[in-house]
Amino acid sequence: MISKLSVNPTFSPSYNIIVDSVLDFSHILEYVTNKQVLVVTNTTVAKLYLTKFLPALVDDLDVRTCILEDGEQYKSQQSLDKILSTLLENHFTRNSTVLVALGGGVIGDITGFAAAIYQRGIDFIQIPTTLLSQVDSSVGGKTAINHQLGKNMIGAFYQPKVVYTSIEFYKTLPQREYIAGMAEVVKYAFISKDFYLWLDSNRDKILAKDSVTLIEMVKRSCQIKAQVVAMDEKELTGARAILNFGHTFGHAIEKCQNYRGLKHGEAVGVGMAQAIDFSHYLGLISQQQAKDFKDFIVSFGISIDFPNDICQKEFLEAMLLDKKNSNKELKFILIENIGSLSLQKQSKNELEQFLDISR
């Protein structure tokens, strides 16, 4: 069973997302028209899937691999340099090269960024192997590496040629990674009331990992993101900002833990709960709504407990570095109801007061 949908960005060429019930890498062959292929993956995924992927490529291709360490802390300049050096050392040229990102969100982000900047842009293909990367980071063209002062601070908007994935990857995906991915899925439920209702009615099948339901879940999640990206590919109008619900708080958590604590999806789960509480603090929603929204998150196995190893001062400083901020104004994606999120400006003092009473 294959589900296919199209992403139509504002400024870039359209591309397909292919969600498969089985794992058949041959689906990407029509997109590998280049003669030089660099497969970028990490140590974990390489052991599981590299020997399955490489034989799917045709014999006349010049195929090389670049294997990075696994973890958010390796979404770094050093890892980027390793990819670029591999390309240069093997004389890969702009018109003959395609990068393949075989892995989760870190691999997709860093490979996409390498593709964006190598010789001013080369083709790349996304093969996301985690739920989180399937429904979020592989779609929409955001590519980046982290800086010691903040997450995703160095990057570019750069779209892939195609996204191919399969729910077969879940067979080797740790449960913690699966639940982390569910946080991004639940985020889309707060953006779309229809999807909220669908998730609510299919919760048991999702938690049981029913194949047909999971394919539909991934497809619907990608459709929601694709619709937003089509309106505002490069965050010029503000429409795309709603995709960052939970991320302002979540990114700060990751930064404070040096990207070695909560996984990205886990931090987003906590971040959504923080954004919900902040919305209640500001009078945008009732206490009952806040409880209902947080209960919905938790019902999918997602923890919303704030880490106890983060001090408020450090957390506030991390939030001040958020990319959405401008002219010393803090910007948050806040919720007024299911399907009603908005980008709002708040003062540093308002945030400090909220953090004081929420700890």
Curated annotation (Swiss-Prot):
Cofactor(s) annotated in UniProt = Co(2+); Zn(2+); NAD(+)
Q: Which HAMAP family match?
A: DHQ_synthase
Instruction: List the record's Gene Ontology CC terms alphabetically.
Output: cytoplasm
Per the record, the major location class is: cytoplasm
Q: Which residues bind NAD(+)?
A: 70-75, 105-109, 129-130, 142, 151, 169-172
Entry annotated with the keyword Amino-acid biosynthesis: yes
Sorted alphabetically, which SUPFAM superfamilies does this protein's record hold? Dehydroquinate synthase-like
Organism this protein belongs to: Francisella tularensis subsp. mediasiatica (strain FSC147)
Provide the GO biological process annotations: amino acid biosynthetic process; aromatic amino acid family biosynthetic process; chorismate biosynthetic process
Q: What is this protein called?
A: 3-dehydroquinate synthase
Q: Name one GO molecular function term.
A: metal ion binding
Name its pathway.
Answer: Metabolic intermediate biosynthesis; chorismate biosynthesis; chorismate from D-erythrose 4-phosphate and phosphoenolpyruvate: step 2/7
**PANTHER family the record matches:** 3-DEHYDROQUINATE SYNTHASE, 3-DEHYDROQUINATE SYNTHASE, CHLOROPLASTIC
